Amino acid sequence: MAEKRDYYEVLEVTKTATVEEIKKAYRKKAIQYHPDKNPGDKEAEEKFKEAAEAYDVLSNPDKRSRYDQFGHAGVSGAAGNGGPFGGFGGEGMSMDDIFSMFGDIFGGRGGGFSGGFGGFSGFGGGGGGSQQRRYRGSDLRVKVKMTLKEISTGVEKKFKLKKYVPCNHCHGTGAEGDGGSETCPTCKGSGSVIRNQQTILGTMQTRTTCPTCNGEGKIIKNKCKECGGDGIVYGEEVVTVKIPAGVAEGMQLSMGGKGNAGKHNGVPGDLLILVEEEPHPDLIRDENDLIYNLLLSFPTAALGGAVEIPTIDGKVKVKIDSGTQPGKVLRLRGKGLPNVNGYGTGDLLVNISIYVPEALNKEEKSTLEKMEASDNFKPSTSVKEKIFKKFKSFFD
């Protein structure tokens, strides 16, 4: 499967582009690769879909924020459906779905340019063709709790969703039987009507949604007895979600087409998965790094030795050098979490503290008193300076 291109690159805009600039760039791409302008050209069709996918994400503030933070995984591929439109293929969005969803850009598939592009249409009012409305189902939201271990490897989670699904009795049409619906007599099935208006500049044509069928192009004569004419019923579905490694608390993934079904075989909504991170008993997360606070006994810090450190994959032995000072940080490279976009892995940082006992017996006290008298146990000027600098850094 080809790697997805950066959405900003697809539309040829900067990451600071405004919504209007993004809309203008998308319109330019859509005109360039429009199927009416490039009949039978599969490559142009794919680029047309790619531009629509990029526009869907970058024109939506929430999706754009997730994309800027997490890349494609934040809005699409993590859910295993290839994109916010399910990859624009298979069970994903069709060309008609794109025209339906971006009607404010296209003005309907049939309207638009009457010259310059031959049969090219799709951007404006006028012209003939179909502009049938497809209802979009609402999005569903679920929360998923993940351990650091699951985050480190990625995981599949199953959800049993209570949602609206297409009615089996009428196959989503909302009509009872084959003759339950008929073509709208007002718009002749196009879903829109053209109105002529006289102005000082002459006759102006405007296209509006058909008031008789509300843009559907059909009228239901006999409503389905199971769904009442909506084409959807309340049911359930088990969905398997592939969550990538490296996700973080608060990240929202999108699984295209797995939300509520749309009325009358409309476009289904999306399933939005909010990640919640379960706390680890020993490790603290700092972006892709993990932190462990190690409390050493004074003898081990002074004499050196080996201690066990917990990691995501189990415990590992770490060498402690003699004379280890409090505040020292050991770095275990590659023992952190992977980047959600696949760029490298964090480290495990071991912060060392020295344990000082609160109570001593006579023998311990006597031993420490003898040690205190030795010049070797008195901090040197360099050690004092290091401690002062470290203390001062907390306030800088």
UniProtKB/Swiss-Prot annotation:
PROSITE patterns linked: DNAJ_1, DNAJ_2, ZF_CR
CC cofactor: Zn(2+)
Domain J: 6-71
Keywords recorded for this protein, A-Z: Chaperone, Cytoplasm, DNA replication, Metal-binding, Repeat, Stress response, Zinc, Zinc-finger
Compartments, as annotated in UniProt: Cytoplasm
Chief localisation class: cytoplasm
A GO CC term assigned to this protein in UniProt: cytoplasm
Molecular function via GO: ATP binding; heat shock protein binding; unfolded protein binding; zinc ion binding
Binding site for Zn(2+) 1: 167, 170, 224, 227
CC cofactor note: Binds 2 Zn(2+) ions per monomer.
Notes concerning its domains: The J domain is necessary and sufficient to stimulate DnaK ATPase activity. Zinc center 1 plays an important role in the autonomous, DnaK-independent chaperone activity of DnaJ. Zinc center 2 is essential for interaction with DnaK and for DnaJ activity.
Membership in a protein family: Belongs to the DnaJ family.
Function of the protein: Participates actively in the response to hyperosmotic and heat shock by preventing the aggregation of stress-denatured proteins and by disaggregating proteins, also in an autonomous, DnaK-independent fashion. Unfolded proteins bind initially to DnaJ; upon interaction with the DnaJ-bound protein, DnaK hydrolyzes its bound ATP, resulting in the formation of a stable complex. GrpE releases ADP from DnaK; ATP binding to DnaK triggers the release of the substrate protein, thus completing the reaction cycle.
Cited HAMAP family: DnaJ
Protein name, UniProt field: Chaperone protein DnaJ
Gene that produces this protein: dnaJ
